[in-house]
Amino acid sequence: MNAPHTMHRTKKLPPLRVGVGGPVGSGKTTLLEMLCKAMRDKYDLVAITNDIYTKEDQRLLTVAGALPAERIMGVETGGCPHTAIREDASINLEAVDRMLTRFPDADIVFIESGGDNLAATFSPELSDLTIYVIDVAGGEKIPRKGGPGITKSDLLVINKTDLAPMVGANLDVMASDAARMRGARPFAMCNLKALEGLDEVISFIERKGLLVG
């Protein structure tokens, strides 16, 4: 039986579900804010945020004006954040269904996970594309530590490149390690606060998500 949002959808292609994961403080919410502001005039967007005990990221996106408040939904996961996006994604799958019932013609559903470790990944039932965000302040060694977030995500974002001189990180080393760990999978060096690298992320979403020819 078709879900309500499927029956009322007028667009031919299904909505693209983009999962955004990464450790606490890496810049996931900043990335989501910048993506929404840059893409909302071209695409029909909705966003779902995950926090363990609050809906702080939903509030931050709303206050920042990333999207109208009704297009942003906060999910309180409780417990381990990765469980709600991988082992038992039912709470997020339900949130996606609710948002698509309200906005059946959404082009993209962004799903931000709660802050987690390098082993966190999205269930393929929940996300079509995964973006994993790490930051330079976490240390030059982060890319070579591996883990599914580093090696298996569709796009790795290395954020806060502007902080490299302050923390003694060599960006060339980080880029080399990322390329070695990821093989053919792409990565982007970004300073999202200054919008540096954002166009590269948007281009990836459009190209890999088949939003453009």
From Swiss-Prot:
Q: Does the keyword Ion transport apply?
A: no
Q: Does the keyword Aminoacyl-tRNA synthetase apply?
A: no
GO terms in the biological process aspect are:
urea catabolic process
User: Which Pfam families does the annotation name?
Assistant: cobW
For this protein, the record's CDD domains field holds: UreG
- InterPro entries in the record: CobW/HypB/UreG_nucleotide-bd, P-loop_NTPase, UreG
Provide this UniProt record's keywords sorted from A to Z.
Chaperone, Cytoplasm, GTP-binding, Nickel insertion, Nucleotide-binding
Annotated residues that bind GTP are located at 22-29
**Gene Ontology cellular-component terms listed:** cytoplasm
Question: What are this entry's molecular-function GO terms?
Answer: GTP binding; GTPase activity; nickel cation binding
Q: Where in the cell is it found?
A: Cytoplasm
Family matches, as Gene3D superfamilies: P-loop containing nucleotide triphosphate hydrolases (3.40.50.300)
Give the family, as the similarity comment puts it.
Belongs to the SIMIBI class G3E GTPase family. UreG subfamily.
* Oligomeric and partner information: Homodimer. UreD, UreF and UreG form a complex that acts as a GTP-hydrolysis-dependent molecular chaperone, activating the urease apoprotein by helping to assemble the nickel containing metallocenter of UreC. The UreE protein probably delivers the nickel.
Q: What does this protein do?
A: Facilitates the functional incorporation of the urease nickel metallocenter. This process requires GTP hydrolysis, probably effectuated by UreG.
By what name is this protein known?
Urease accessory protein UreG
